[in-house]
Amino acid sequence: MDSELKEEIPVHEEFILCGGAETQVLKCGPWTDLFHDQSVKRPKLLIFIIPGNPGFSAFYVPFAKALYSLTNRRFPVWTISHAGHALAPKDKKILTTSEDSNAQEIKDIYGLNGQIEHKLAFLRTHVPKDMKLVLIGHSIGSYFTLQMLKRVPELPVIRAFLLFPTIERMSESPNGRIATPLLCWFRYVLYVTGYLLLKPCPETIKSLLIRRGLQVMNLENEFSPLNILEPFCLANAAYLGGQEMMEVVKRDDETIKEHLCKLTFYYGTIDPWCPKEYYEDIKKDFPEGDIRLCEKNIPHAFITHFNQEMADMIADSLKDDLSKM
């Protein structure tokens, strides 16, 4: 089925300047410009995927394709990279827009707050205000999703899926206890080491290493994410990770309560970033919410082997909402 999806479903790659940062956007489906499309055939809804960290949108292409197919190819499925996590190839044109009245560069765009504003800036400039949205946040993308709802409550979001959501106590999680000293205290050692090892490395060697790594991880290589071994992108991912450990502490119950009717939380049973007790706590505090615990032992990084299972869950949950569109 994966090979069929790869052959039949169009995916359009763009590099844009958003908030002053190069950004990769992968658009699943035939629609590439929703903002200026005035035709009657323009879809009424966009499914928008916000990745975890590192925010390599190319990793989510198989998931986006599966979801596009399961929703009967009626709606575009777009995935955005995080600011600073993708650099355009030298032969690739970077698109700009003048539509945003708030088009100034975003302060600290590679940090936690800047990444949230980066996603909001993209929606302002590339998605019509009246277009309905389904937001899908993975890992720290779930935190971004909640913050987007908090900052712009008028966003026309009909559903938001928070997959393996790192929305609280990140530094206290099993992985967080390991990552915190590395990302917060030894970050500059990582920067220098990465730069010294990777900067002199020929592109052909990097490409070979990436291809082998993607094969091992079962990740599709349709859009080769060379940025995996780019020191600039790795440094930005580490910088964002350090802020996650320091700032993602308390769960935003006020925002969750306000938007609970449109939220679906999906927790893992074997997730070292948000352990089962986090699920039990939020389930206790919001018993009426759609808060689910995975029964299939799907790992936090579901994009390595479980794209179809996650797409099935989301498509099934959206059936009633999409039937009204």
UniProtKB/Swiss-Prot annotation:
A GO CC annotation given for this chain: lipid droplet
Catalytic activity, as annotated: a cholesterol ester + H2O = cholesterol + a fatty acid + H(+)
Keyword flag Iron: no
Alphabetized GO MF terms: sterol ester esterase activity
Gene3D superfamilies reported for this sequence: alpha/beta hydrolase
First-tier enzyme category under EC: hydrolase
Tissue expr: Present in macrophage-rich areas in atherosclerotic lesions (at protein level). Expressed in monocytes and monocyte-derived macrophages (at protein level).
Family membership noted in the UniProt record: Belongs to the AB hydrolase superfamily. LDAH family.
Function: Probable serine lipid hydrolase associated with lipid droplets. Has low cholesterol esterase activity. Appears to lack triglyceride lipase activity. Involved in cholesterol and triglyceride homeostasis; has opposing effects, stimulating cellular triglyceride accumulation and cellular cholesterol release. Acts antagonistically with PNPLA2/ATGL in regulation of cellular lipid stores. May regulate triglyceride accumulation indirectly through stimulation of PNPLA2/ATGL ubiquitination and proteasomal degradation. Promotes microtubule-dependent lipid droplet fusion.
Protein name as annotated: Lipid droplet-associated hydrolase
Organism: Homo sapiens (Human)
Classification of source organism: Eukaryota, Metazoa, Chordata, Craniata, Vertebrata
